[in-house]
A protein has these predicted regions:
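Register position in tetratricopeptide repeats
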Residues: 38-39, 72, 106, 140-141, ...
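Eukaryotic alpha-helical solenoid repeat scaffolds
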Residues: 310, 330-487, 492, 535-564, ...
């Protein structure tokens, strides 16, 4: 059914022209967009609302709905922009103020969020929801008393919402009023006995008060309400560990990892429990996982070094202590432990040097006892083998960035555009369907091959068919004078069967016959680039844009051998001179510039491509990646938002990752 509706929409989008505004049914598109959103099909909702807004720029409800769809896809910057447009079109749009405030709150822009809430409340002081959402924002902004006041106002009108009591209880907890916090958690439970969060919150308070029996009962109830509620398994595991039941603790940590296999904090805690029962090898495996997901956390290496030493891996232990020291040079304990291990390795001078540094750090610590962060790492009596609570990474814990994303999380540029052979299908390159170049259309007509298309997608012609087609072109070239059109097609088939050197030669022969044709240079360029990528893959040395947990890292190349795209770029320079208004030339050149590490030049070329084709989704996507690498994350995410709006679903995956990191 959904595919059928999408097909109807696409057909309508193609038939509606600038002069056929009367055919456009505003209410229909609005209704279909809402229907997609009710089904949580937010990407189709955005595509539908794009059609609505293309023909009715004043449809403020359309911007509002599209903003909600983007919000649900974690495209917060795009959502904020759409809510802003809705407000500009309708300055008394109360709900748009509320939703923009919520979006700005999630972006950490609390001041502007509070201003929006004030506008919404001034417009409609009788509506309770704005008070609740402002209370949450004030809670996040650590304005706890003001947040309590907002939750009070909300509860006066809506006294059956358990989350309001829950959040008010959290505010009291931060104000050290555990009595009021406990009372609010109890009211939340009475209001909704099926909400696992209420039991979990009360259990956390009881756990901090070492009332383990009551805490365990609350975590049991939370799990009974929702068997997939991760937090309560995690907290109950800590209760089991605190009450000397390590096997039950491990079972709960195992369950957490079944629900979230990338949860670094759980691996860390499970490693501690495993080491406590002498299961050092499996503890080491867990610490390896933590190091993989959170490569910049000092405690991972410190604790893993201790396990390595227990297992007799002295050199590995020294490496881990060295890494801990590299991350935190004032870590006196790490110096002391490395000193002992270096002594065992007969490195007496290194051992003595570490011991002297440690003693100096300890002396400095004694003069700076008021600096708690410093003292933790310089205090030789401090233990680092205690389990960490789930909010440790957001509550100023020494564990820091335990929940950071994988260090090996790689995101590649979208590929180059080139002329290739594809059998017709229902899918098309996102941009290709919206951009028309008469010169390119005339070129394809001249070639007269119904399978020829300009795309960034791979050919879908079977390999054996490509080989047969290439042999046919070879016979034709031998039987008659070689035309540039036939040479061009032979170059394509040679590229597709990975005869790159021959393909470059064939394209060169075509260029010799028609040196003023920009499309011949375009394809020779992409073939040269593909040849470089193919060679680099054989060397196991991919050179590509990657995004890592450390945003300071740049283009990666795992081998010392490097490859350059100079000849491919030179072809694109020639193509740009011959046809300066063709956006795909600049897009391809930008890709090669990025792969060569020339990020500012890549940014400029993507921008030129977008100027020539404002609906160039792939260019927005790749420019977004480049800007993220240039540490302009906000602008990069704005480009990702536009790419997603224009139809690239991968953009929302990146936005989700960066939204998660900023929370």
């Amino acid at each position: 059914m959904r595919k059928g509706i999408t097909g109807v929409l696409l057909a309508l989008a193609l038939t509606i022209g600038a002069g056929s505004r009367a055919q456009y049914d505003r209410d229909y598109f609005y209704y279909v967009g809402r229907s997609f959103m009710i089904d949580n099909n937010f990407e189709d909702a955005i595509r539908t609302l794009n059609i609505l807004l293309r023909f009715d720029d004043d449809a403020y409800e359309g911007y509002f709905l599209r903003g909600i769809a983007k919000y649900n896809l974690d495209d917060l910057l795009g959502a904020e922009a759409d809510f802003t447009t809705a407000i500009e079109k309708n300055p008394v749009f109360t709900t748009a103020f509320t939703y923009r405030a919520i979006t700005r709150s999630r972006l950490g822009n609390y001041d502007d969020a509070l201003s929006d809430f004030a506008e919404a409340i001034e417009l409609r002081p009788d509506l309770p929801n704005a008070y609740y959402s402002r209370g949450v924002t004030r809670l996040l902004n650590q304005q706890f008393r003001e947040a309590i006041d907002d939750f009070d106002k909300f509860i006066r009108q809506e006294n059956k919402v358990s989350d309001a009591y829950l959040n008010r209880g959290v505010c009291y907890l931060y104000l050290k009023d555990t009595t009021q916090a406990y009372a609010n958690f109890e009211t939340a439970i009475r209001t909704n006995r099926e909400n696992p969060m209420s039991y979990n919150r009360r259990g956390e308070l009881e756990m901090k008060q070492q009332r383990y029996k009551e805490a365990e009962a609350d975590f049991d109830m939370a799990i009974r309400c929702d068997s997939n509620y991760l937090l309560s398994y995690f907290n109950r595991a800590i209760v089991y560990s605190s009450t000397n039941r390590p096997m039950q603790s491990l079972a709960d940590f195992d369950r957490v990892l079944q629900l979230d296999s990338t949860n670094s904090l759980t691996y860390f805690n499970r490693a501690i429990v495993r080491s406590q029962i002498g299961d050092y090898n499996r503890a080491l495996e867990d610490y390896d996982k933590v190091a993989f997901y959170s490569p910049e956390n000092v405690l991972v290496y410190y604790n893993r070094a201790g396990i390595q030493a227990q297992l007799g891996n002295i050199e590995s232990a020294v490496e881990d202590y060295s890494k801990a020291i590299e991350l935190y040079p004032d870590f006196a304990n790490a110096y002391l432990n490395r000193s002992r291990l270096r002594y065992l390795l007969k490195d007496e001078s290194g051992s003595r040097r570490d011991r002297d540094i440690a003693q100096r750090k300890i002396a400095e610590y004694k003069t700076r006892l008021s600096d708690s962060t410093y003292s933790i790492y310089a205090d030789t009596t401090h233990r680092f083998d205690r389990l960490l609570s789930f909010d440790a990474n957001v509550a100023g814990s020494t564990f820091g960035r335990i929940a950071s994303k994988s260090a090996d999380n790689r995101l590649a540029l979208l590929p180059l555009f080139r002329f290739t052979l594809r059998t017709p299908d229902s899918l098309s390159t996102v941009t290709a369907g919206r951009y028309h170049s008469q010169r390119e259309a005339d070129f394809r007509r001249r070639i007269d091959n119904r399978y020829l298309t300009l795309t960034a997608r791979e050919s879908n012609v079977p390999a054996d068919s490509l080989v047969m087609l290439d042999k046919r072109y070879a016979r034709e070239l031998m039987a008659e004078p070689a035309s540039w059109e036939l040479l061009f097609q032979r170059g394509i088939t040679q590229t597709l069967i990975k005869q790159y050197t021959n393909a470059v030669g064939t394209f060169t022969s075509a260029i010799d016959q028609y040196p003023a044709n920009p499309f011949l240079y375009l394809n020779r360029s992409t073939t040269r680039a593909e040849m470089i990528d193919f060679i680099s893959s054989i060397d196991n040395s991919y050179q590509r844009i990657t995004i890592e947990s450390d945003p300071a890292k740049r283009l990666q190349n795992s081998q010392s051998r490097t490859y350059n795209y100079d000849e491919a770029i030179a072809d694109l320079n020639k193509a740009a001179k011959l046809y300066p208004d063709f956006p795909y030339t600049y897009y391809n050149r930008a890709n090669l510039m990025a792969l060569s590490g020339k990020l500012p030049e890549a940014y400029n070329d993507y921008t030129k491509a977008i100027e020539l084709n404002p609906a160039f989704a792939e260019a927005y996507y790749n420019r977004g990646l480049v800007q993220i690498f240039m540490k302009d994350t906000r602008k990069g995410c704005l480009d990702m938002s536009k790419a997603g709006e224009l139809g690239i679903p991968e953009a929302y995956e990146i936005l989700k990752q960066y939204t998660a990191l900023d929370r």
